[in-house]
Amino acid sequence: MTTYNLCIPRVFNTFDESQIRTTFEQLNFGHIDKVVIVRKKNEKFNIAFVYYRKWYDNENAQRAIARLENNQDIKIVYDTPWFWKVTKTNPR
Protein backbone atom coordinates (compact mmCIF):
# COMPACT_ATOMS: atom_id res chain seq x y z
CA MET A 1 0.00 0.00 0.00
CA THR A 2 1.28 3.45 -0.91
CA THR A 3 2.10 5.62 2.06
CA TYR A 4 0.65 9.06 1.50
CA ASN A 5 1.93 12.07 3.34
CA LEU A 6 -0.45 14.94 3.89
CA CYS A 7 -0.27 18.71 3.52
CA ILE A 8 -2.43 21.22 5.35
CA PRO A 9 -1.86 24.39 3.31
CA ARG A 10 -3.55 26.73 5.82
CA VAL A 11 -3.09 26.16 9.54
CA PHE A 12 -3.62 29.01 11.98
CA ASN A 13 -0.27 30.02 13.45
CA THR A 14 -1.63 29.22 16.92
CA PHE A 15 -1.44 25.45 16.24
CA ASP A 16 1.60 23.41 17.18
CA GLU A 17 2.81 19.96 16.07
CA SER A 18 1.25 18.24 19.07
CA GLN A 19 -2.24 19.59 18.38
CA ILE A 20 -2.08 18.54 14.74
CA ARG A 21 -0.73 15.09 15.63
CA THR A 22 -3.52 14.54 18.16
CA THR A 23 -6.19 15.47 15.61
CA PHE A 24 -4.81 13.04 13.03
CA GLU A 25 -4.22 10.25 15.55
CA GLN A 26 -7.93 10.39 16.43
CA LEU A 27 -8.76 9.72 12.76
CA ASN A 28 -6.83 6.44 12.92
CA PHE A 29 -5.51 6.75 9.36
CA GLY A 30 -2.19 5.21 10.27
CA HIS A 31 1.06 5.43 12.21
CA ILE A 32 2.35 9.01 12.11
CA ASP A 33 6.09 9.40 11.73
CA LYS A 34 6.23 13.16 12.29
CA VAL A 35 4.44 16.47 11.89
CA VAL A 36 6.30 19.45 10.47
CA ILE A 37 5.06 23.03 10.50
CA VAL A 38 6.57 25.51 8.06
CA ARG A 39 6.23 28.84 9.79
CA LYS A 40 5.47 31.95 7.75
CA LYS A 41 6.72 35.19 9.22
CA ASN A 42 4.11 37.87 9.84
CA GLU A 43 1.33 35.63 8.52
CA LYS A 44 -1.85 34.38 10.18
CA PHE A 45 -1.41 30.92 8.63
CA ASN A 46 1.36 28.33 8.37
CA ILE A 47 1.72 25.18 6.27
CA ALA A 48 1.83 21.79 7.99
CA PHE A 49 2.87 18.34 6.78
CA VAL A 50 1.86 15.03 8.34
CA TYR A 51 4.27 12.21 7.50
CA TYR A 52 3.03 8.66 7.90
CA ARG A 53 5.20 5.62 8.51
CA LYS A 54 2.28 3.34 7.55
CA TRP A 55 -1.42 3.61 6.75
CA TYR A 56 -3.84 1.26 8.47
CA ASP A 57 -6.25 -0.99 6.62
CA ASN A 58 -9.53 0.32 8.02
CA GLU A 59 -12.61 1.99 6.60
CA ASN A 60 -11.62 5.52 7.61
CA ALA A 61 -8.17 5.21 6.06
CA GLN A 62 -9.54 3.58 2.90
CA ARG A 63 -12.02 6.44 2.37
CA ALA A 64 -9.22 8.98 2.76
CA ILE A 65 -6.92 7.07 0.40
CA ALA A 66 -9.67 6.82 -2.23
CA ARG A 67 -10.07 10.60 -2.21
CA LEU A 68 -6.31 11.19 -2.30
CA GLU A 69 -5.86 8.79 -5.23
CA ASN A 70 -8.49 10.79 -7.14
CA ASN A 71 -6.56 14.00 -6.37
CA GLN A 72 -9.34 15.22 -4.10
CA ASP A 73 -8.80 16.89 -0.76
CA ILE A 74 -9.91 15.57 2.60
CA LYS A 75 -11.92 17.78 4.95
CA ILE A 76 -10.63 17.28 8.50
CA VAL A 77 -12.77 18.82 11.24
CA TYR A 78 -10.51 19.82 14.12
CA ASP A 79 -13.05 21.83 16.15
CA THR A 80 -16.62 21.98 14.85
CA PRO A 81 -17.30 23.88 12.62
CA TRP A 82 -13.60 24.56 11.90
CA PHE A 83 -11.79 22.29 9.46
CA TRP A 84 -8.67 21.89 7.34
CA LYS A 85 -8.63 21.03 3.66
CA VAL A 86 -5.88 18.43 3.42
CA THR A 87 -4.12 17.26 0.26
CA LYS A 88 -1.51 14.61 -0.47
CA THR A 89 2.16 15.26 -0.95
CA ASN A 90 4.43 13.02 -2.98
CA PRO A 91 4.52 9.39 -1.78
CA ARG A 92 7.68 8.12 -0.16
PLM regions with names:
Residues 67-92:
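Low-complexity RS/RG/RGG-rich segments used by eukaryotic RNA-binding proteins and nuclear co-regulators
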Residues 2-47, 51-60, 69-71:
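Canonical RRM/RBD RNA-binding surface and closely related RRM-like beta-sheet modules
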Residues 63-65:
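"Short basic amphipathic alpha-helical interaction patches in structured regions
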